[in-house]
Every structure is written in structure tokens, then in C-alpha cells.
From Swiss-Prot:
GO terms for molecular function: chromatin binding; enzyme activator activity; identical protein binding; protein homodimerization activity; single-stranded DNA binding. The modification N6-succinyllysine is found at residue 122. It comes from Rattus norvegicus (Rat). InterPro entries: NA-bd_OB-fold (IPR012340), Primosome_PriB/ssb (IPR000424), ssDNA-bd (IPR011344). The keyword Phosphoprotein applies. SUPFAM superfamilies: Nucleic acid-binding proteins. Residues 30-141 form the SSB domain. This is Single-stranded DNA-binding protein, mitochondrial. Its main location: mitochondrion. It is found in: Mitochondrion; Mitochondrion matrix, Mitochondrion nucleoid. Residues 1-16 form a transit peptide. One of its GO terms (biological process) is positive regulation of mitochondrial DNA replication.
Amino acid sequence: MFRRPVLQVFRQFVRQESEVASSLVLERSLNRVQLLGRVGQDPVMRQVEGKNPVTIFSLATNEMWRSGDNEAYQMGDVSQKTTWHRISVFRPGLRDVAYQYVKKGARIFVEGKVDYGEYMDKNNVRRQATTIIADNIIFLSDQAREKPLNG
């Protein structure tokens, strides 16, 4: 008499647990980054033995704001903060294009994902590194085109 309700509750509990577990497996998430800025250095291509090569460069993004109260907001001092991002390009076609055409000072748009990785430095100390794994790069300017022509 008491067994049957306990068995029903147990079955219902197991079913709910399995539904929760399966929904976690099927749950979608998003790791997406979009950056618009200027390249800080010409790219380098690195290859660790047994791994695919990677093109690496830095990208600066700027955040600007005015200080002051609401009335003086238009007249306030402009402050700026620059954030540097490490961009890594692994996709073969994009990696080669980035290595060849990304140049210091160029204005580019990068789409990708954030990756928090670890590596061993030259002193054999474990370090953490945050990088943007690029899967799309749009070239918005060419440094050579922006320089004024003399003469």
C-alpha cells in the first residue's frame, strides 16, 4: 500500500532528473566577440611542433567619455581608456590573409570568441592568457591609403 506511491514518486524524480540532465546537454550558449580598432603591431606567425600555425597580433580599442555634471557635460574634459586585445587566427585561409595584409595602424573589425588559456613561459612558470580567436576580419582601412601623398 505504501510501496506504490513511493515507487511513483521515485520514477517521477528520476524522469525529472534525466530531463534536466538532457536539457543541460542540449542547452545553447554563446561566446561571441566583436572588436573595432587599430592594429598595434604587424602580425607574427608562430608554430609549435605538432600543432597548426597561428597568426598573432594586437588590437587596440578605445573607450571615451566626458567628465562633469549634466549641465557641463558638453564642456567636460574628454577621457580615454585604451584596451589591448591579443588576436589569434587559426583558420588556414584567414590566418594567411591576416599574416600578409594586417599591418600596424590599420583599422579593422574582428569577430571571434574569447579563449582563456594557459601556457608555460620560458622560466617554466604556468601563465594564463586571454586571447580572441578570430574567425572573421574585415579590413576597414589601409595605413598606406591614409597617409597623405607628398607632391
